[in-house]
């Protein structure tokens, strides 16, 4: 990947983070922390890798994306808006009565959403079904799902992992957001799921652990997924919750609340400065 390509993606990621802040500020609630830390991987999937078309969001041979950690919907909505599925201005309607941008993704209301999610563990199960369906139909469809490291405390995730390996779902890419924080504290103190890499390998997954904010590593891992033809892939994304906004970074306090007016102003000032720096670097 060239530096110019990485700069373009970084700008998309910055816009995604701005959208997260806009939405959660307008709603006065939501989950900004775990939304901010997946901006890089979402920008790569939606602007480089996935076979999708905003003009035809339901085309049968499209790749599928399932946000299993459905509470991070602000990041998905901001990504879809950035990609052209709906107007960016609509992000300010997050969680409003009558809005098609509810607190958790709704496939029946929101253009570009492939699966309704929210109940932790169910999204990865649905992704397995999509991947198996594509295999049975012999369609060249890849299925991506992002789940949280707190989410893997749910037993349903491990049932899904067992299912994926049994059916050799090589078209399934599980992306595990490893930020080490969940609503009640660190994952290590609430319910330690480590060592995740070894456990997933024991479930017969192709497992890669990368820096979830590094585009070169993201691209290499996704290419390794495409090269795998016998087993499902799990990419463990080492991330920092709240990345991009100083006072939200690595803070459990920002798992589930929206910024007030003062906090919004600070966050947007920081993100605008970050975008301006990228623009300057691009000259």
Model-identified regions with their sequence ranges:
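N-terminal hydrophobic or amphipathic helices/low-complexity stretches enriched
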Residues: 1-16
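N-terminal capping segment at the start of a domain
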Residues: 13-29, 177-179
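Cofactor-binding active-site loop characterized by glycine-rich and histidine/acidic residues
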Residues: 20-23, 35-166
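Generic beta-sheet signal
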Residues: 63-65, 141-145, 172, 231-239
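Glycine-rich beta-alpha junction loops
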Residues: 71-72, 76, 179-180, 214, ...
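Short acidic, glycine/serine/threonine-rich loops at helix termini
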Residues: 77-79, 106, 156-158, 184-188, ...
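Thiamine diphosphate
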Residues: 112, 116-119, 124-227
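Glycine/aspartate-rich loop-and-adjacent alpha/beta segment that forms the canonical ThDP
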Residues: 215-283
């Amino acid at each position: 990947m060239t530096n110019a390509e990485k700069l373009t993606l970084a700008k998309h990621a910055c816009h995604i983070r701005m959208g997260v802040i806009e939405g959660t500020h307008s709603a006065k609630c939501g989950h900004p922390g775990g939304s901010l830390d997946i901006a890089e991987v979402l920008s790569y999937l939606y602007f480089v890798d996935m076979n999708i078309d905003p003009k035809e969001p339901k085309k049968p041979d499209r790749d599928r994306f399932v946000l299993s950690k459905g509470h991070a919907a602000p990041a998905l909505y901001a990504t879809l808006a950035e990609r052209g599925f709906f107007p960016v201005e609509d992000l300010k309607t997050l969680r409003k009565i009558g809005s098609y941008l509810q607190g958790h993704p709704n496939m029946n209301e929101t253009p570009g959403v492939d699966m309704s999610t929210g109940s932790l563990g169910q999204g990865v199960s649905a992704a397995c079904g999509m991947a198996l369906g594509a295999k049975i139909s012999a369609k060249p469809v890849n299925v991506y799902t992002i789940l949280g490291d707190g989410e893997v405390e749910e037993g349903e995730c491990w049932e899904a992992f067992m299912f994926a390996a049994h059916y050799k779902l090589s078209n399934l890419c599980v992306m595990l957001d490893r930020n080490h924080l969940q609503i009640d504290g660190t994952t290590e103190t609430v319910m330690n799921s480590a060592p995740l890499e070894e456990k997933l390998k024991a479930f017969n997954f192709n497992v890669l652990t990368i820096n979830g904010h590094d585009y070169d590593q993201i691209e290499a891992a996704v290419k390794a997924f495409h090269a795998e033809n016998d087993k499902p892939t799990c990419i463990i994304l080492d991330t920092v919750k709240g990345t991009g906004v100083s006072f939200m970074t690595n803070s459990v306090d920002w798992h589930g609340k929206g910024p007030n007016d003062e906090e919004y102003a600070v966050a947007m000032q920081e993100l605008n400065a970050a975008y301006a720096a990228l623009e300057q670097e691009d000259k």
